[in-house]
Amino acid sequence: MKFVSWNVNGLRACVGKGFEEIFKSLDADFFCLQETKLQPHQITLDTPGYHQFWCSAEKKGYSGTAIFARREPLSVTYGIGIPELDTEGRLITLEYENFYLVTCYTPNSQQELARLPHRLTWDEAFRNYLSALDKSK
């Protein structure tokens, strides 16, 4: 299996710079994107043969993740399961028979560590989330 993970820093701008051609040329089984900065209805991508999964931030034009998967998953989870951490579209989990695929856009602590408490809360919750997934497969 071939996995690709790419922080696109704004998918609309990336599409204007040849994203679809790159996507097709990489021929990945799973293509994970971080920092999409859009709502799924704001873009149409030509990705035949892929299932698309989007997790967008409530705040428009901010963060967001997506996964394009050739194989349909058994289940899909959006977010980490903690409401105060799940408004920024930072995590998608696809479940398959023998594994989970998780794409994550981790929060930045920002200038002068303004969001450090949020980041530390996220880091602990993410570790716990991954640990729980690990125990289930």
Task: Label each residue range with its predicted role.
Residues 1-46, 57, 62, 78:
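N-terminal, active-site-proximal structural segment of metallo-dependent hydrolase catalytic domains
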